[in-house]
């Protein structure tokens, strides 16, 4: 099994954009909520509910060049993974994002493309 698709949006993390609700609980920001809602439109394989071990490779192309000398902004790859995994669960691509299903995220990285930010996703079954 191999699924490939592209989410043509600037990648957004979930944790770094959170706001506190009235009860003090961390809530996703409007920026993340918009990202999730829009990303769902670009996922072609909704509701397949993968429940076997898979590798989710994600190449994140961002508007900001985090590797440019002097750039003080940073982005956390793990937070990008968390946001993507949550989107995939919401879309029904993955049954859950626990380690029994998302076995690995090998090959993932952050790159720069100011004119065409996106996330290229490849999901492949892992033989244990």
Predicted regions: what is each one?
Residues 1-128:
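Acidic, proline/glycine-enriched N-terminal capping motif
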């Amino acid at each position: 099994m191999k699924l490939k698709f592209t989410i043509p949006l600037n990648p957004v993390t979930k944790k770094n954009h959170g706001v506190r609700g009235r009860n003090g609980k961390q809530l996703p920001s409007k920026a993340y909520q918009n990202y999730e809602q829009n990303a769902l439109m670009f996922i072609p394989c909704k509701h397949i509910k993968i429940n076997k071990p898979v590798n989710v490779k994600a190449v994140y192309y961002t508007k900001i060049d985090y590797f440019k000398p002097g750039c003080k902004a940073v982005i956390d790859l793990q937070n990008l993974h968390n946001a993507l995994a949550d989107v995939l669960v919401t879309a029904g691509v993955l049954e859950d994002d626990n380690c029994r299903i998302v076995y690995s995220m090998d090959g993932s990285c952050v790159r720069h493309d100011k004119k065409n930010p996106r996330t290229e996703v490849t999901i492949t079954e892992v033989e244990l």
